[in-house]
């Protein structure tokens, strides 16, 4: 299923005719240019590789420069892939625009969440804090026991503990499309999406309708 790579512009709100306020995220979806078409014979799977935006040639390393030169496509700010069916008719240099969402009502959006640094269990996993008083003087925000006894004598894998929060790949599913501005290549979706303002987002038609 193909989609588009875009940029998060920020959040705002729009009003319906009844006066209801809808919080929306504005996503800029400029044309995506196909740089490579992968198939079963050469790559063992079918996909298209796309780029978007513009990157100066002097900011490219040699492998990137050679790849864009071979495809004859204007260098973009990155490379992304979308899986396709075996019988696809995509060609190198072809452009994919925001028009692919004209008949779509909901989308799945993937991005890199904001990094929050090293965080404790209360902030990271919503652990309950311990008593503020009643004899507790040192253990207000500690996780408490992390295991059992001599049996099993270890901490189980996956135990929720303190660690880095955020800066991970996150997908938010089934966000409603509120408006499409084809002239300015803007997509307005209801609600929040992962990532900071200006970060890259992958927008696809929703799997769950």
Curated annotation (Swiss-Prot):
Xref: InterPro entries: Ribosomal_uL3 (IPR000597), Ribosomal_uL3_bac/org-type (IPR019927), Ribosomal_uL3_CS (IPR019926), Transl_B-barrel_sf (IPR009000)
Molecular function (Gene Ontology), one example: rRNA binding
Alphabetical UniProt keywords: Methylation, Ribonucleoprotein, Ribosomal protein, RNA-binding, rRNA-binding
Single biological process term from Gene Ontology: translation
Sites of N5-methylglutamine modification: 150
Residue stretches spanning the membrane: none
GO cellular component: cytosolic large ribosomal subunit
PTM info: Methylated by PrmB.
Disulphide-bridged cysteine pairs: none
Role noted for this protein: One of the primary rRNA binding proteins, it binds directly near the 3'-end of the 23S rRNA, where it nucleates assembly of the 50S subunit.
Similarity comment: Belongs to the universal ribosomal protein uL3 family.
Subunit description: Part of the 50S ribosomal subunit. Forms a cluster with proteins L14 and L19.
Stored NCBIfam families: L3_bact (TIGR03625)
Designated name of the protein: Large ribosomal subunit protein uL3
Naturally occurring in which organism (per UniProt): Buchnera aphidicola subsp. Acyrthosiphon pisum (strain Tuc7)
């Amino acid at each position: 299923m193909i989609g588009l790579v875009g940029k998060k512009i920020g959040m705002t709100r729009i009003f319906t005719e009844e006066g209801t306020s809808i919080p929306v995220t504005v996503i800029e979806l400029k044309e995506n240019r196909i740089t490579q078409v992968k198939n079963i014979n050469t790559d063992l799977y079918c996909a298209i590789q796309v780029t978007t935006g513009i990157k100066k040639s002097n900011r490219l390393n040699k492998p990137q420069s050679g790849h864009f030169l071979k495809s004859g496509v204007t260098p973009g700010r990155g490379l992304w892939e979308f899986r396709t069916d075996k019988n696809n008719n995509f060609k190198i240099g072809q452009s994919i625009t925001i028009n692919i969402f004209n008949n779509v009502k909901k989308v799945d959006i993937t991005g890199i969440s904001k990094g929050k640094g090293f965080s404790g269990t209360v902030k990271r996993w919503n652990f309950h804090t311990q008593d503020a008083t009643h004899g507790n003087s040192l253990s207000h925000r500690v996780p408490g026991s992390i295991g059992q006894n001599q049996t099993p004598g270890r901490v189980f894998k996956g135990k929720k503990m303190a660690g880095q929060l955020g800066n991970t790949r996150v997908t938010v599913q089934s966000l409603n499309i509120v408006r499409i501005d084809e002239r300015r290549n803007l997509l307005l979706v209801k609600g929040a999406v992962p990532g900071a303002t200006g970060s890259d987002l992958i927008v696809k038609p929703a799997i769950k309708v």
